Amino acid sequence: MTRLLLFSFSFLFCLTAFAQTNNANYDSTLAKSFGADNYGMKNYVFVILKTGPAVIEKKETRDSLFAGHMKNINRLAGENKLIVAGPFGKNDLKYRGLFILDVKTIEEAKELVNTDPAVAAKIFDVELIPWYGSAALKEYLKTAEKITKHKH
């Protein structure tokens, strides 16, 4: 009998140890507007831009391609498809920058990335990786807009 009682208490303790608690601050309307799941997360595509095989010697051409790259970044951000973008510092991996795209599939991400003139010209190669992150990440752009003094 003592063993049965001890087992029962141990079992109940284990059940409560793994129980989930609800967040008192949860806003279902906000979560739905962000496309959040029950954990406040959603799927994105993480893009790593790497040094590509093309070497563009002509400065005017290179400058034009990078201007197009920046214009494309701004367009995608304006369409709420690009959530985060930025360059990496110098590194041995030949990683040049990253994007986080608010799309559901790798195929959608490929379509968007291929609109970048620097990618099309093979200045950059890309790696596309499914990524699961905070659905609130899109709020980052609103704050970034308020603290950016000079735009590209």
Predicted regions and their residues:
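Conserved, structured core segments of small domains
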Residues: Q20-H152
